[in-house]
């Protein structure tokens, strides 16, 4: 079966491609990407005004399985992902129970293999129960397919524990995905600290609560030779720190929420 997608804005950074082109798909595989394809096809779609890309990857999602299915589950979450052009999702470990062992990783992957509309990858916890007290079974989880590790929703407060995690994870070449905000500085804040928070009377979160956490994580990453990924960056100071870390050759990546 042949499918022809006409006049879409084809965008693929890996191929340095950003142009209005046609795509010919035959038996589920891309056969040609070019301007003005005239070959006959069983199905023809006019993608004028639309963007056509490889499947997007969302590295920070919450499928909420196991234990929190009232909020979301693998079926509903991956249906929403696929509808938005996302073909691979990585689900965070702050579930009930926390994804802190190999058997839970295997269970999620098995569940996803049976019922999902997108590829599902699993992020394991850095610490047992996300309590920040003892390292989780990161090695075992990596062998079972975990693509990274995070205490998502929690700052790894102990610098020693984080250092041990960073040194250990280099053996498995996986990123530590970090909720980088110092909770003592953030206190009970609900929004960025500034003129707006003061005017409307909502407790603000000072930007240094993020900046200090990001700086610590980058310094430890440099020391350990680990890859750290800073989640939901929200301050200019954190961006500046990440840029400087990259210039120094530290393996740091980052994301913002959309």
Task: Identify the function of each model-found stretch.
Residues 70-78, 130-140, 216:
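Short, acidic/polar
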Residues 66, 92, 123-125, 152, ...:
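Structural motif
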Residues 59-72, 95, 121-134, 201-207:
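Active-site mouth loops of central-metabolism enzymes
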């Amino acid at each position: 079966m042949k499918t022809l997608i006409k006049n879409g804005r084809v965008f693929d950074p890996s191929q340095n491609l950003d142009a209005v082109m046609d795509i010919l798909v035959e038996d589920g595989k891309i056969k040609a990407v070019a301007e003005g394809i005239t070959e006959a096809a069983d199905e023809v779609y006019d993608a004028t005004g639309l963007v056509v890309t490889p499947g997007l990857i969302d590295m920070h999602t919450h499928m909420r399985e196991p234990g929190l299915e009232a909020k979301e589950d693998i079926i509903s979450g991956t249906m929403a992902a696929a509808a938005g052009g996302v073909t691979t999702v990585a689900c965070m470990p702050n579930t009930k129970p926390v994804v802190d062992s190999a058997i839970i990783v295997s269970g999620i992957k098995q569940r996803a293999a049976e019922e999902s509309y997108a590829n599902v990858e699993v992020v394991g916890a850095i610490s047992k129960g996300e309590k920040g007290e003892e390292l989780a079974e990161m090695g075992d989880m990596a062998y079972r397919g975990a693509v990274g590790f995070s205490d998502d929703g929690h700052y790894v407060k102990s610098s020693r524990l984080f250092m041990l995690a960073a040194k250990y994870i280099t053996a498995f070449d996986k990123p530590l995905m970090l909720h980088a905000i110092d909770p003592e500085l953030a206190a009970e804040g609900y929004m960025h600290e500034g003129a707006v928070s003061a005017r409307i009377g909502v407790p603000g979160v000072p930007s240094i609560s993020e900046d200090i956490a990001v700086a610590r994580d980058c310094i430890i990453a440099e020391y350990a030779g680990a890859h750290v990924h800073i989640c939901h960056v929200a301050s200019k100071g954190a961006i500046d720190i990440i840029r400087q870390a990259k210039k120094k050759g530290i393996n740091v990546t980052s994301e913002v929420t959309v």
